[in-house]
Amino acid sequence: MKKAIIDLGKFDYLFGKASGTKNASHNLPRTKQNLAQMRRLGVPDDVNGQILIQNHFDGIVNEPSNIIKTWTYKNSQFEIRESLFAGPGGFAKFESAWEIMSDGTRRFTTVIIKGGH
């Protein structure tokens, strides 16, 4: 089973702590939306929450039937995967984007969390 590659900064993005100026007009509102969703789903902003997300993403990158879109950009290949995330406080549909690395592993780039308010 291949492990999903998730850069540590992506956990900041998921838990409302993204910073910086790169794409700030998009990333800052999105990181706040992600934080609200993580809270609604009952995912703690700690190592246990990171493990929950890592385990979910490890499972989905090993399931070929959940790929809903693929594309190439600047000699890199990407895909969107659809999944149902079950948190301690509820469920949400994840549309996660992945860069396909040369060895076939997947590197997490972003996610759109759908469902709930």
Region locations from a protein language model:
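Compact soluble domain cores
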Residues: M1-S83
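Basic/aromatic recognition patch in beta-strand/loop cores that engages polyanionic ligands
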Residues: K74-I100
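A short, surface-exposed interaction/processing loop segment used at functional sites
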Residues: G90, E99-H117
